[in-house]
């Protein structure tokens, strides 16, 4: 109740303020900024306390072969496992260690912090595998900052309907992270905390699989770079995230409350973004935030407004292969944006003329546009001039000879299937489908299939309308929402905890069936002939490989 009152108070203060910015970003009143800064200061303070507790075990495990390398900026800066992160893992993050060989930590409650909470599990040091014996919504009061490396978060282990993280952002400020079958649905509109549902400063060896991220106030997910501070007083270095995969995930319905309904900013070195769905985000579907080779294949993009896939810079290289773009109700079919596959950027060039990176663009389908589907370069690759104005096809085509690559650029190993087959696969399998797909993803996927938007019967425009919004107050009818209430809010997530007598993350029934001792917690970490520990074998057994990678 107190938080809702503060939100109302801050929004009212903003409405009464005469000093609006003429950019797309709101002007934050001083009292709002003070409150936000105070909250973040306390969040960092609590994170620092947890970090100090974690450092001794991080140092100990570094001496045992699991070093902490926050300065990594090239793919070979980080050692990689000889084992796949899990069967079906692909791309640059396929050999992330995650929590392999570490202890098991069971999340037992939905609290923001304290023993048994997700935050407590994530803030601990050392290799760790986080499992769930609780279902429901975990409402974060402050950002969840994950700093210690070597962690696996296994949402598929939750009972019943599974878990959903809400209220604040999750920051992956480390390396060797595996996140599977998790929902990050932020859902807040407080102007002082316009942030992603999940993002942060990811270093590398990141594997994101079957994640559902939505209702972010900046983007739903950002993964492309990290800022490294060597503590010597030098300026922070901006380094690319290395060895990263985002696969089989859904990024939908970013909140447009502050004119910022953005899907994702992605990139990095040795990256792969494959078999994902971006739906009902006005822009950044996704945006390309780094100048390495951007590998984007077998994805589905639906119902964008002013931006589909764009970004990079004049040194970037792009593999844009076999993706399915479906304009939706908010997409202006008469405008070039409706058939845009890629808009590479040249803005960072200091040359007096425009210059663009090189691109392999092939096999992509623009639903309803036969011309661009037949030849992706016949209108699908769009360029801007030095003034930021969109070139005509005749103007842009003069640059194509230098831009167009005959063959794909080198990429990490991924399975690339025919575009329509990929579209069906994504709609059937993407997102946190285990322990079961929730009503949010079910509704979004249905919208992609039918092209029709579903809203709550009592949906109405937000009481406050940011004056610089591009879209009208009832844009939710076209799929671009400003508040979660317009689509019915959070669903219920129910589930009964399973019996786990030794608290090792494996249900007693599973242990008995597989010859393990349900009263001996130590067997969870024992390595099997497969190379995986018993707990990892259990995690993998829950997930059919057919929903991870197409046959």
Regions found by a protein language model. Name each.
Residues 1-24:
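Bacterial Sec-dependent N-terminal signal peptides
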Residues 24-85:
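Primarily auto-inhibitory N-terminal propeptides
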Residues 25-36, 43, 54, 58, ...:
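C-terminal functional modules
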Residues 86-130:
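Acidic Gly/Asp/Thr-rich repetitive segments characteristic of extracellular carbohydrate-active
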Residues 119-126, 138-152, 163-180, 186-203:
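Extracellular beta-strand-rich solenoid/capping regions of secreted or surface-exposed proteins
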Residues 150, 155, 175-186, 204-218, ...:
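Right-handed parallel beta-helix
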Residues 156-163, 182, 519-521:
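Extracellular beta-strand-rich, repetitive "passenger/adhesive" scaffolds
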Residues 295-307, 317-327, 331-366, 371-392:
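Predominantly extracellular beta-rich ligand-binding scaffolds that present long acidic/polar faces
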């Amino acid at each position: 109740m107190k938080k809702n009152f503060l939100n109302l108070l801050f929004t009212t203060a903003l409405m009464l303020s005469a000093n609006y910015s003429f950019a797309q970003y709101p002007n934050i009143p001083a009292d709002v900024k003070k409150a936000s800064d105070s909250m973040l200061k306390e969040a960092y303070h609590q994170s620092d306390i947890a970090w100090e507790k974690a450092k001794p075990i991080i140092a100990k495990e570094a001496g045992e072969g699991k070093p902490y390398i926050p300065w990594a900026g090239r793919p070979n800066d980080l050692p990689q496992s000889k084992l796949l992160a899990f069967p079906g893992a692909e791309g640059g993050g396929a050999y992330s260690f995650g929590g392999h060989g570490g202890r098991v930590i069971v999340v037992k409650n939905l609290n923001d912090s304290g023993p048994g909470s997700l935050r407590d599990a994530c803030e601990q040091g050392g290799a760790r595998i986080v499992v769930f014996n609780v279902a429901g919504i975990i409402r974060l009061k402050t950002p969840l900052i994950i700093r210690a490396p070597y962690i696996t978060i296994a949402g598929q282990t939750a009972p019943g309907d599974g878990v959903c993280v809400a209220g604040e952002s999750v920051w992956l400020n480390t390396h060797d992270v595996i996140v599977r079958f998790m929902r990050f649905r932020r859902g807040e509109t407080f102007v002082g905390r316009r942030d992603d549902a999940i993002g942060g400063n990811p270093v590398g060896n990141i594997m994101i699989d079957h994640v559902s991220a939505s209702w972010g106030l900046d983007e739903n997910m950002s993964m492309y770079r990290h800022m490294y501070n060597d503590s010597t007083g030098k300026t922070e270095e901006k380094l690319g995230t290395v060895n990263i995969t985002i696969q089989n995930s859904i990024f939908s319905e970013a909140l447009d409350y502050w004119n910022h309904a953005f899907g994702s900013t992605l990139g990095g070195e040795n990256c792969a973004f494959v078999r994902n769905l971006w739906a009902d985000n006005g822009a950044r579907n996704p945006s390309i935030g780094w100048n390495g080779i951007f590998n984007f294949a077998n994805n589905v993009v639906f119902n964008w407004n002013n931006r589909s896939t764009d970004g990079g810079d004049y040194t970037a290289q792009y593999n844009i292969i076999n993706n399915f773009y479906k304009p939706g109700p908010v997409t202006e079919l008469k405008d070039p944006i409706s058939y845009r596959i890629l808009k590479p950027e040249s803005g960072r060039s200091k040359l007096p003329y425009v210059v663009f990176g090189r691109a392999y663009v092939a096999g992509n389908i623009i639903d309803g546009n036969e011309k661009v589907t037949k030849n992706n370069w016949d209108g699908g690759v769009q360029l801007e001039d030095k003034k930021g104005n969109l070139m005509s096809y005749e103007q842009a085509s003069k640059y194509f000879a230098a831009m167009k690559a005959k063959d794909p650029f080198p990429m990490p190993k991924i399975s690339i299937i025919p575009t329509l087959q990929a579209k069906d696969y994504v709609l059937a399998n993407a997102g946190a489908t285990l322990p079961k797909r929730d009503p949010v993803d079910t509704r979004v996927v249905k919208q992609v299939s039918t092209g029709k938007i579903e809203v709550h019967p009592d949906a109405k425009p937000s009481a406050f309308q940011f004056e610089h919004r591009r879209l009208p107050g009832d844009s939710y009818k076209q799929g671009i929402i400003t508040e979660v209430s317009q689509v019915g809010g959070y669903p219920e997530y129910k589930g009964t905890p399973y019996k786990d007598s030794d608290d090792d993350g494996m249900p007693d029934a599973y242990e008995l069936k597989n010859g393990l001792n349900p009263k001996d917690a130590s067997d969870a970490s024992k390595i099997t002939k497969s190379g995986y520990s018993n707990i990892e074998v259990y995690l993998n057994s829950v997930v059919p490989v057919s929903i991870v990678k197409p046959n």
